[in-house]
C-alpha cells in the first residue's frame, strides 16, 4: 500500500498536519499533482475545516494542472491515466470531454461497462454529440448487447446522416448475424458518405473474398484502403494476402518488403507479430525457407495460433537448438489437429539431434495414438505454467525453426504414426476384398466461399465412386448430409461411409487408413494423417495453397511432398477442376495396375 494512503500513517501524521502539508507542497513542486491532491483529501477527511488544505486544493483545481496525458496513453499506461483523471473528477465532472476521455481509457482497458457509464454521463451533458452516441454503441456491442448497440448507431445517424462510421458498425452487426447482403449495403453506404472510411473498405474486402469468393473485388477494396492509410499494417497484410492466395506471390512479397522498409519502426508489437506471420507464409511459398522460419518465430501472439496466452508460461522458451541438448523440453500444441499431425513428423529428428527428453502436450483425441507413436516421449494433456522440472518450452511448429528444416535437408521428416494393431472393426472387415480401397475427402469441415476455392464437391468424384473395381471410402469428417444430395441414389449407396466418428475417433481412422491402398483429398486432417502414417497419399491444393512445399507449388503442377515422401501433390485451379479429376483418376489407375497387374481405365 502507498505510504501516503496508509490509514495508520495518516493517524500518526495527523498529530502534525504541517508535516502532511509540507509533503503535499513538495509534491506540487515536483509536478506530482494527483499525489498532492490525495494528501489534501486525506487531511480534509479528518479535518474538514482545515483552511490551508482547502485553499491549497482549490488552487490546484483552479489551475487545472492536468499533465499532458498523450505520452502515457501512447505508452499504454492506462492505469496511470485513469488515476490522474479520477483525481480531477470533482473539478471536471460537469465537462463532457472529461467523461469521454475517461471512457476512452476504460475502453482501451477493455472495461466496457465503465466505458459505457462514462460515455452515458458525457451524453447527458452534451445530448447532441453523435460521435458519443456512436461510441456508446461500440460499448454495447463489445458487451454483446447487439439490439441496443444497433439503436445507438441508428440514433447517431439520425443526428448526423453523413456519419459513415455508424453505417460501418451497423454493417458489422449484420455481418455478426450473417446477413451479408445487408452488411454489404451498409458498408457501401459508408464509403459513399466517406470514400476514405478504411474500416468499411476493409470489411467490404473481407466480405468479397470470405462470402462471395471474389478475389478481384476484394483486391480492389484492399488496394483502396492501403492508398488512404499506407501506414496501417492491416491494409498491407490484407492486400498481400489476397495476392498470395491468387498465386501472385511476387506481388505479395513486394508489398511486404516495401511496407516493412517504410513503416517498421512505427509498428506495435502485436501488429508486428501479425505482419511477420503473414510475411513468413509468402516467404515459405516462395522457397525462402530460412528467412521464412525467422519471421515465423514471432507468430505466437497472433489470434488463433496458440490455445493459451503464452505470456503466462513462466518456463523459459527455447530460442536455439544448442540450449536443448540433454534438456527436458515441453512441446505445446498450436493451431488445429491437422497441424499437430503434420508438424510432429520432425520430432524424432529433433530428439536425435538434441538427446532431449520431451514432454508432449497433446489434444485429447490424439492422446493414445501419439503415445504409441512416440513411446520415448511423455504425453500429457495439460501442464503447469511454472513447472520447475521443465528446462524449456516450445510450440510444435518451432521444430522446423530449430532444425532449420528446408528442401536441402534429406530424411529429417517422415511417417511416424503407429496404429493400434489390436484394434479391429467389423465395418472394415466387411469391405469387399477384391477391390481397390480408395479413401478420400473433398473439403474442409469449415466452409465458406473463400475456402471453397481450395476444395471440391463430392459430386466431382462421381467417376471414382461409380467404378466397380473400387471401394470408394468416405474420409470426410463432419455432417455430409447436404453433400450426399449432390449424388444420385445409386452413387449414395455405393459410397462407403464408416460407422464411427471420423472427426473424433483417430484410432479407428488409423485402422481404416491402414486398409486403404490410396488416400487423397485436400490439405486437411484425414490426408495429413494418411501421409504421417506412411500411406500412399495425394493432396490437391491451389497453386498458392501449399506454403510447406517451400516453393514447389508455384513451379510445378505436381510434386513430391517435402515432409512425407510417400505423399504427392496436385496443383489445381477452380477454373480447371476437370483437370484435377482427370489427374486423380490417373493416380488411381496406376495404383490399381500396381496392385493387380491390370489396367483399369476410369
Enumerate the language-model features and the residues they cover.
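Alpha-helical solenoid repeat scaffolds of the TPR/TPR-like class and their adjacent stem/linker regions
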Residues: 1-518, 523-602
